[in-house]
Amino acid sequence: MKFICLGDVVADIGLDAVKKVLPRLINKYGADFVVVNGENANKYNGISADDARELHFCGADVITTGNHVFKQKSIYPLLDEEDYILRPANFPSSAPGTGYTEIKTPFGTVAVINLLGQVNVENVDNPFTTVDGLLKKSTRTTFWLTYMRKRRAKNAHSGFILTAKSRRFSEHIRIFRPQTNSFCRKVPHT
């Protein structure tokens, strides 16, 4: 199965670029599943319902978010109504939406988990405890974990959550931050 993961889409210029390029990338590489972090897709910060619909229409199977997800009020109903837009799973259960979805593909069902790190972020549960609980409930064998965090050290720890069970994408790495060289393969198929 071929995945494309894009993030962090920022403002109108980022949204316009994704709308223009993503369909071509999907075609060129034969992508079977696309995950896009759209939490900053709106020009005013956050993501609106229209932004999410545009990303989904141009090819995003799942849109993940982070701590800015609730900045645009129009996203609230969409979070509750659609399975393609996620907020972090470790937000309080009273928050709109969910942080876990299962999407059917020709290759089987892919479970996507969206998490947010706790450093410099208030009112979120432990991401490791949250993902452990989700894994115990799921019967899926293919997981896609998106983990947005504010500190690079958390990246290494997140790699062990779904070892040999998943694809993992750590988000919130922007081009103006120092290079991390944090890529590593834990075991085959992770």
Identify the role of each PLM range.
Residues M1-T190:
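Acidic, metal/ion-coordinating pockets
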